[in-house]
From Swiss-Prot:
SUPFAM superfamilies: YcgL-like. This is YcgL domain-containing protein IL1825. HAMAP family: UPF0745. It comes from Idiomarina loihiensis (strain ATCC BAA-735 / DSM 15497 / L2-TR). Residues 1-85 form the YcgL domain. Coiled coil: none annotated.
Length: 86
């Protein structure tokens, strides 16, 4: 399965994952308005992966299948502090 990743023009470190070739039809208009202009940053082949930076491929595929998209928000401040202290 291929997945397209888009970066938000309005929100830092915010990304939208869509099935490859999807035209944003499953993304709510309210979310698209807050997301701003979507800049495509990459296409990922999920077939040979188990883990992405912040979630498993299985979890991402569940979101894509059930919702038609996955919204990745910036990590919470506490998460950043824990990662720095490791």
């Amino acid at each position: 399965m291929l997945c397209d990743v888009y970066r938000s023009s309005k929100k830092a470190d915010t990304y939208l994952y869509l099935p490859h070739g999807n035209e944003f039809t499953d993304v709510p208009d309210v979310l698209l308005g807050q997301f701003g202009r979507a800049e495509k940053v990459l296409t990922i082949n999920l077939a040979n992966r188990e883990q992405l930076a912040r979630l498993t491929v299985e979890k991402l595929q569940q979101h894509l299948h059930n919702d038609g998209f996955y919204l990745q928000l910036p990590p919470k401040r506490e998460e950043l502090q824990v990662n720095v202290n490791k």
